[in-house]
């Protein structure tokens, strides 16, 4: 296997620390570094020498990990001369005898890459032996998994969104159910749930609070407290469960963060309780007014071509749909015709370029799957 340059994908080692801007990215990096380092330590054979030169198998020598912790200069990995000259990897042009290895001059470059797969190497899991643990192969860092780990998702998207994304593995499902119940109980007053009676929040008295500011804060908090009686609690749970987790009933592919949009979908978009934007007001016992009759249109790409003032989500006639498509096509065509002052049709070129690339990638099939962290 030839050396094709450093492993593609996001770095998660120490290397481009400066590019990691936000604190959570930095935390992510530091975290994965810790993990990596311990993985790396585990790769050493028991009782392997910690001298600057180590042997991993009969004909390989490599610098030890100790070298990049102190400022010792790292030596190149060297291949000892064997009786079988074909066993030497072609990338190592120089061939060393074991005796001469120790006369090597030290250098600042990282160790040479020696791919050893089935060569009887005792470090089974290592594809490339090198002295720098940040550059271990992908499989030790963010290996593409069938499903990303739950805590990775939580770190990336936050708990609420993750719960909504996690649709395909059982632990996620029970997690989601529990968190949904917990969220409803925390956000809606618990006493109301237990009492089964309609609740009215008691009016606050000014004299119970030291400063005006405390009083105002408390008033604000009180506005966001919604009471559900037992029946409505049940209903809210069912409704949220159906809406957020519909795709457990089979409308799901793992990547979708929401159910697929169908004709009747999102007629009354209820913000999920998990990301608590608004309560299901028609169920809230102490809601001052009912919902306004006009339902806001979700801002979703599949709806953008319709007039936002049109609130009837009835299925359009075939003819209307065809007209719509024609109009869109015409618009795109017009855009394609625009030339700059040198007569170049940029939009057209972009389009062609994009399609060409798209086709190329499609033809390669899964062999060129992106190796990103969560794919």
UniProtKB/Swiss-Prot annotation:
Highest taxon of source: Viruses
Name of the featured protein: Non-structural protein NS5
Source species of the chain: Maize stripe virus
Encoding gene (name): NS-5
